[in-house]
């Protein structure tokens, strides 16, 4: 056998061996990629369910809230007990344009007035968690409306909307509040006050065209956008980067519920806002990182004010600096009337 023929035979044998090895290698590669994709999809389903699934027993949660509020604000326990005993909170339920039943509590001022506060609760909480602020406004002679957001409290719904689609519901509640509290000669004069996700909600409302009776907004520890908030939580709670899980989870949320994490942006809404806004944040907030409030404040054009409470963690500014909180809010809203 010549050297040339031997070389040809060796090359042929090598190629055959390579082809035989290539097929299982290809199958292994496909299997690994498929497994990774399935794991990613499963992780995305878990994340969206973990982050957006409503409280499993919201009726039981309502009962617990009375106890929690009394423990959190012991100086106000007497008022909470009085409100409950005398049934000072009225219930109202309406059908939203999206065809779900939404619930709210409302309380009339001690004396007839058109001054009205709509106070919006936070993530996985309910309207009763805003009773401390309801008392604050009631003491100032305001009517108060406390809505349960979609998939919270006594409202229908299974998955949380992080304040984004909730903006339309709060705008509807604003109309309801005006019907409830306007006088025979004048509309109500409303302040929209939100805490945490509720703050994100009222900021999203501020970017829409609102009636003249909506006078101003107070946002307490709201986030810049859902993407940034979830990115922060992925890092802090799970030590995970944004890629790829946050991307696929946002896509899955869009597929299932028609919105994504980046478009749900209070920051972009604030840029469009034309009405006065008070920004409040805890100086030691790690859940919604404190630097977010500076970005929001900078983006707001027109009348604005900022209160950062030193040492306050998430949604604890009212408890940590009670007098400063109340004085700042009162002065701000009085300046808008």
Spell out what each predicted region is.
Residues 37-95:
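An N-terminal hydrophobic leader/cap segment in hydrolases
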Residues 137-156:
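Conserved alpha/beta-hydrolase
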Residues 160-181:
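Alpha/beta-hydrolase active-site loop
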Residues 204-259:
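Hydrolase active-site cap/lid region
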Residues 273, 279-281, 285:
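Short beta-strand/loop motif that positions the catalytic acidic residue
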Residues 275, 289-298:
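Short alpha-helix in the alpha/beta-hydrolase fold that links the catalytic acid
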Residues 312-322:
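Catalytic histidine-centered segment of alpha/beta-hydrolase-like enzymes
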Residues 321-337:
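Catalytic active-site module of serine/aspartate enzymes centered on a nucleophile-bearing elbow/loop
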